[in-house]
Swiss-Prot record:
Mg(2+) 2 binds at residues 721, 723. Mn(2+) 2 binds at residues 721, 723. This is Glutathione biosynthesis bifunctional protein GshAB. In the N-terminal section; belongs to the glutamate--cysteine ligase type 1 family. Type 2 subfamily. The gene is gshAB.
């Protein structure tokens, strides 16, 4: 069958780049000094029996990070980035992920290498068998398994354009068998470009072991890596022959079970190999990628893109020998390349030239212009072995050592994970509370699907239990009407007042002129102007000592800009506190100090704001724990009330407030007060939220004196607002005080069977 012609058909070409990707990556945990960790798998990751993203491989110290299936290499790497952040921040503080395929220095005694402590006893027994049959040390090598599937739409179009095979499932299997054979034949190129295990640490090989002449390109991908015994031979001529050979090996005792068969490429269908006759081959797993220590993920996007184009090439190019001989030639070439010196030119230059030239021709024929740059980059390395991963490693190792290389990069990547611990790599454009929520969900092993990134809409799943979450705390636990109640400040006040809670008096206006005419009633009072239905403190102006008509009018203009109706309310004196109530319990209390700067007698207000905004904890759009302080109309109005402008130079230690309202979302500072506020106020908050019918709520109380016990029917407090989607990041990472992991509390509410 001429796949090259099929791939160029008009109906096929729009689909040639469509594929599905997945990745499994192993790393040993080591100390920050580069010694194999001795701790058990962190319990913070939950149960390994179901965790979809973070598992252990052979040993208790060998993490396996698993991405969900993605429709692009970029999306796959994005999730891998997030899983790395979770893994690195969750392991003990004195540990890191060892960035090399070859393990750090191993203990002298094999019994000190601990097999993974799994719940499934048969899995433990299987690892014990592998340890006895192949030795523990070979099992400690780490790498990447790259899962690749041609999109079903591409397979269907190819199938429709041919007439030799009359069943699409059989056609798909035929495609993957061809690609598998070609991969085994040409995998030497992958070993050359991406091999990254040139040397081993002391005690990896025993004195009586057969050892390579180090350095090489890839110990892991040579006969010195992990592989079956020489008497295990399997044909790739057809799926039937492949399965028959493996079955015979098991029957003859050469393999303990089907999954013991280990090859650079694995054919995948159902959950077990025995499912393949029924399911056919659904995708293939490439198992010969070493960890790239020059990437904090162990792999770079260019490598993923190259592998994608390489997989297209393997379908494009013809086989030139009988199947078993074709594969055997590939084994010989791969061994030659794997055991070559990292800085030596390979003997397969001519074949490499042909492969790269044909790949470029294929990209031209299929109209894949963007692929030529990536392919060209790696083509350049064909004659420059020092630029390959193993070549660059050997350059460093010669001047330092392999362990030093591992230590330098391992520590660097571990530190990078903590530069902005409140963000989640791969998802930094999402709201901060959602990022923290995603971190916790990944850590605990909940399956995640991002339904709408712009809307912060997530789907979580554990077994058959599915939950939908918006903005990190809008869940099925609150019914539809609850957010509508809290969105409407007039309705909120009426419900709370009817339930016996103290709320400020005031008026509602939908007409700018009518509101303006109310000025005389408030000119000499303390009052607040705010939109009727907004969150995050937008459009609010506070006048503690009355206001001129000009300022009153400006406040109305600002409020009407946010909503079609505004409220003018009495100002309640006291300190404002945000109570975060979840499931009839106060989980956190926050004192929010309005946006402010402290003078130094030298710099203007504008310059002081710029300096304070340089704090890495400050950002925009809820992607940092604190928001940038603005200098817009509201802030300038606030300065005017203090007799200042943005060009004024405040005296030393003079505190200048730029906002009257204390929302962190408008540049305020957050201070945790959970353990300071009397329980009487917590009870008031709980009862008020219950009156609104909410499970999750941020409710704002004004308290004149927190040392005086609060009572529901008194003036010891006043409720000024309730929020249906309260920000959580300011509680998790406060400006001062203890952080409260509210995102984990939400997860516990949704999945008590997972989060204990």
């Amino acid at each position: 069958m001429n796949y090259r012609e099929l791939m160029q058909k008009k109906n096929v070409r729009p689909y040639v780049l469509m594929a599905r990707f997945g990745l499994e990556k192993e790393n040993q945990r080591s100390t920050r000094e580069g010694l194999l960790a001795t701790t058990e798998h962190p319990t913070v990751f939950g149960n390994r029996s179901y965790h979809p993203y973070i598992q252990t491989d052979f040993s208790e110290t060998q993490l396996e990070l698993i991405t969900p299936v993605a429709n692009s290499g970029t999306e796959m790497l994005r999730f891998l980035d997030a899983i790395h952040d979770v893994a690195r921040r969750s392991i003990p503080e004195d540990e890191m992920l060892w960035p090399l395929s070859m393990p750090p220095q191993l203990p002298t005694k094999d019994e000190e290498i601990k097999i993974a402590k799994l719940d499934q006893y048969d899995a433990v027994l299987y690892r014990r068998y592998l340890a006895k049959e192949y030795g523990k040390r070979k099992q400690m090598v780490s790498g990447i398994h790259f899962n690749f599937e041609y999109d079903q739409a591409l397979i269907q179009q190819l199938y429709d354009e041919q007439s030799e095979v009359t069943d699409c499932k059989q056609f798909k299997t035929k495609v993957y068998m061809k690609v598998a054979r070609n991969f085994l034949r040409y995998r030497w190129l992958i070993t050359y470009l991406f091999g990254a295990s040139p040397v081993s640490e002391d005690r990896y090989f025993r004195v009586y072991d057969d050892q390579p002449q180090e350095p090489v390109r890839s110990i892991r991908n040579s006969t010195y890596g992990y592989r079956n015994h020489d008497n295990v031979k399997v044909s790739y001529a057809s799926l039937e022959r492949y399965l028959e050979d493996i079955h015979r090996m098991v029957e003859n005792g050469l393999l303990s079970e089907e999954k013991e068969f280990y090859a650079p490429v694995r054919l995948r269908g159902g959950k077990q190999m025995s499912d393949l006759p029924k399911t056919g081959i659904r995708y293939i797993e490439l198992r010969n990628l070493d960890l790239n220590p020059f990437s904090r993920l162990g792999i770079v996007e260019d490598t993923v893109d190259f592998l994608h184009y390489f997989m297209l090439y393997l379908l494009w190019t013809d086989e030139k020998e009988e199947a078993d001989e074709w594969v055997k030639t590939g084994d010989i070439f791969n061994e030659q390349v794997a055991l070559g010196h990292p800085h030596e030119t390979i003997k397969l230059i001519a074949e490499g030239d042909r492969i790269f030239s044909e790949m470029i021709d294929m990209l031209d024929a299929l109209g894949i212009r963007k692929g030529k740059e990536v392919v060209g980059k790696y083509y350049q390395q064909l004659r420059n072995p020092q630029d390959t991963v193993s070549g660059k490693m050997w350059t460093i190792i010669q001047e330092n050592s392999n362990s030093e290389l591992g230590n330098i990069f391992g520590n660097q990547y571990q530190s990078m994970a903590f530069e902005r611990p409140y963000q989640l790599a791969g998802f930094r454009e999402m709201e901060l509370s959602t990022q923290i929520f995603l971190f916790d969900a990944i850590q605990k092993g909940l399956e995640i699907e991002i339904l709408d990134e712009q809307e912060q809409f997530l789907k979580l799943q554990h077994g058959e239990h599915i939950e939908y979450v918006k903005n990190a705390n809008m869940t099925s636990k609150d019914n539809y009407v609850v957010p509508l109640i809290m969105e409407n400040k007039t309705v909120t006040k009426k419900i709370l007042s009817a339930a016996g809670f103290h709320v400020p008096g005031g008026e509602e206006f939908s007409s700018f002129i009518e509101a303006q005419e109310a000025h005389l009633r408030y000119a000499n009072k303390a009052f607040v102007v705010k939109p009727k239905s907004t969150n995050y403190g937008l459009g609010i102006t506070i006048f503690k000592e009355g206001a001129s008509l000009e300022d009153f009018t400006e406040a109305l203009r600002i409020a009407f800009k946010e909503d079609t109706a505004v409220l003018i309310e009495e100002f309640l004196p006291g300190t404002e506190y945000r109570f975060f109530v979840l499931d009839n319990d106060v989980k956190a209390i926050m004192l929010r100090v309005p946006a402010n700067v402290t003078g130094d007698g030298k710099h203007t207000v504008e310059e002081l704001v710029a300096a304070k905004n340089s704090d890495p904890l400050r950002g925009t759009n809820h992607r940092a724990p604190l928001e940038l302080i603005q200098l817009n109309d509201l802030e300038k109005l606030m300065l005017k009330e203090q007799g200042l402008t943005i060009y004024s130079v405040p005296e030393k230690e003079q505190i200048v407030y730029l906002r009257e309202n204390s929302n962190v979302s408008t540049g305020g500072d957050s201070i945790d007060m959970t353990d300071v506020i009397d329980d009487s106020y917590k009870q008031i908050a709980i009862e008020a939220v219950a009156a609104l019918g909410a499970k999750i709520c941020g409710i704002d109380l004004i308290i004149p004196d927190k040392d005086v016990k609060g009572t529901r029917d008194s003036l010891t407090y006043g409720i000024i607002e309730a929020n249906f989607n309260p920000a959580m990041h300011m509680h998790v990472y406060p400006y001062a005080g203890q952080g409260r992991r509210l995102t984990m509390d939400v997860l516990k509410l949704l999945y008590p069977e997972v989060v204990q």
